[in-house]
């Protein structure tokens, strides 16, 4: 599973969002058609779970029953494309979400109310990422988050919205549309917090810290850094086991005293056992830290 898919699947397991989230979803992946002298709305995605999420969202919000259709792409990837198809109440949905002008090309940016309200902004960013966003796998060491927009002014409004949350967002225009993007790891982690993907934020941070620790080892070229590298090497097995626990049963399933040691070990892979002991909220002995680390390793080995 790609990291992008992992984030999106975490988002759809959160409680259903508000109208601002749905507005972003429809604005970025919806299209209008005319059949039997009435409008119909199509919302497309390549993820079946997201299609079901959108289906339930519309069904619950407007008490109508959409339809899910799919077809196979004819390109080399041959992915399935899922379409949430709405025939009833389309005019009501467009009016309620203030999207009519957007579909007819009169207003392609983001509603001022969304740009001025933090909660509305968070919901809109969640919907925008869910339907048109991607994150480069942090394992690659090259950090990038992107959201694709058909219109440049929408991409620029997205950047403005992100900047409200102190993110260094930029835009770039392509022939087929425009992209709003983040390239700093800290900005991407903050974005994940803003949209509610807390588990993926922790995974991203753990991977980033692990990569940095490995890079520190590779750069060790004198006695001092060699000693740090030795400490980091000794902690790698435990850090990998902590990540394994995060990916399976979750760190929150551990007793609080093990959670505290695990969080410190991942955050500070260069710390000696004594430094970990001293950094705890209630400092303990080196043997106490070693005992807790052995417990963490055993839990991971048993998974």
Curated annotation (Swiss-Prot):
A UniProt-annotated Pfam family: LAGLIDADG_WhiA
A single MF term (Gene Ontology): DNA binding
DNA-binding region (UniProt annotation): 272-303
Spans traversing the lipid bilayer: none
GO biological process: cell division; regulation of sporulation
Keyword line: Cell cycle, Cell division, DNA-binding
NCBIfam families attached to this UniProt entry: DNA_bind_WhiA
Family classification: Belongs to the WhiA family.
Function field: Involved in cell division and chromosome segregation.
Protein name: Probable cell division protein WhiA
Organism encoding this protein: Streptococcus pyogenes serotype M5 (strain Manfredo)
Gene: whiA
